[in-house]
Amino acid sequence: MTMGLSRLARLAALAAALLATIAAPALPVGAQEKPRTGGILTWFDYGDPGRLDVHAESPLVVQQATAGIFSGLLQYDPDEPSKIIGDLAERWTASADGKTYTFHLRKGVKWHDGQPFSSADVKASFDRVLNPDFKSPKCGASLKPMVASVEAVDPNTVEFRLKFAAAPFLPSIASAWCRVAAKHVLAKYGDLNAAEAQIGTGPFKFKKYERGSVIEWEKNPSYFVPGLPYLDGVKQFILVGGPTQLAAAKASKIMLWDAWPPMRKTQADELGRARTDVDIYQAPINTVFFIYLNAKKPPFDNPDMRRAVNLAIDRQELVAKSLEGAGVPCAILDPKLVGDFALPLDEVAKAPGCRQPKDADVAEAKRLVEKHYPGGLDVEVAVRQVGNYVDRGQLVIAQLRKIGIRGTMKTHESAAGYAAFGKGDFTIIASQDRSMDVNEPSGVFHIAYTSQSGSNYGQYSDPKVDELTERALKETNHDKRKQAYWELQRYLLTKGDHASIAVAWVEGWFFKDKKLRNYKPGLTTYDNNTFMKVWIAQ
């Protein structure tokens, strides 16, 4: 695929390409394949989720593990992934001032345990994620700045009252993380972590979870959309590490690789030589490669030391060596994904820490370190053992050594790493990709930069960042909103002392088995993975 394509254009081109492969079998002119029921789709998770609470967790593996189990009020259309359509809500209206949204719910929907669904479940779910004392790093982080209250008007009607008219509200409600859980299940279990608590209204029922091995769904025969799903089930193998994942793909153990971590070019080429029954494609995945510094303890409670790391990190080298060139270095927003809300890349390339050659920035970084630590210093550099994080971490350690910061690697199992990072138990996280919840410019700031961000692991707070983010969120005029986001990006790039350092927007290679039909990639790595309309051809 052409690297310059926007996400939407890329989706359209990919959909056309996949449609062409569907049409490839010998069919009469004008004939269409009839969806076939049955079969198991095989897929993979990059790690063991451990915990399964979609409201309280942020790892992709949690969302993937539960994607087909729960429904939302809204969803992104499986047939047209840029379009928001109803899910549990059959229709909705907005007030003239854009501050009140009323959702009219489907009638007759049942939970997987046979209990009836109602507006009480919607209110319980969103009251939970909006509770100031409840940490909801995805759905809650998106909605808390916008939503004032949620009311159940009657058993089939829910009303959301906003603090202000907000363009990202509907995309956030349609997010794959803003799923509706059963009030009676929350009351019984207290959270959604147990396999027994995975009781949804989605196209599939939770069947099995073997830690470190496999997650399985089975068809929900009482799904509220007649005739769906087509599949009998979905099997997700837990495959840790690129070599293991690639070996499974080459051996035809999995039919789809559509999520993080993407294949690198060399892996995609190797797969292409091993299998001719797959469609391989390149795409951005709405994901940022971050380095995090712990701003709550030495040495990175010192803004000079945070600036030193920001100056020293060679983003271009990290993209070239760890992503094989498939990424957009330095950008806080990627123009391929959010258009002109992103600061022009030629301006970004001149920012401290991004400009090439690196000599002047490295010299200044070294001066700042020597000012506070004349003999240099030793630090622990943490990564989770997923993707190619360890390799990235070694590159980061080598770059920091040039300015007198001597790093020692500490690796974590995936779930244990998330737990440690969430508690602030680290000094540097050398590599942590964060995927956007919605294809919307506000997403990255609510994920990693504001004081209340769900993935602001460094716990750094800058009132100016919070103020600019809120101003951009409230603005409804496109040009004024663009200027607000430009000001915010310039501020972060110029000040250079934030504890969340954006290395690059990640791109990569993916594949689908040619037998899969009705599959289209979503706007984010979290979307369109319920597989409600996917079927397997013979």
Region locations from a protein language model:
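Surface-exposed binding/hinge segments that line
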Residues: 33, 104, 139-186, 208
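Alpha-helical secondary-structure segments
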Residues: 42, 118-127, 155-161, 202-203, ...
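Ligand/substrate-recognition segments at binding pockets and active sites
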Residues: 43, 211, 241, 258, ...
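N-terminal lobe/hinge region of extracytoplasmic solute-binding protein
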Residues: 44-96, 127, 197-200
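Detector for C-terminal structural segments
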Residues: 60, 64, 210-214, 219, ...
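Gly/Pro-rich hinge or "lid" segments in bacterial periplasmic/extracellular proteins
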Residues: 78-79, 174-229, 233, 363, ...
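Aromatic- and charge-enriched surface segment that lines or borders ligand/interaction sites
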Residues: 90-135, 153, 159-161, 245-248, ...
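Extracellular/periplasmic solute-recognition and catalytic clefts
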Residues: 149-152, 207-218, 235-297, 320, ...
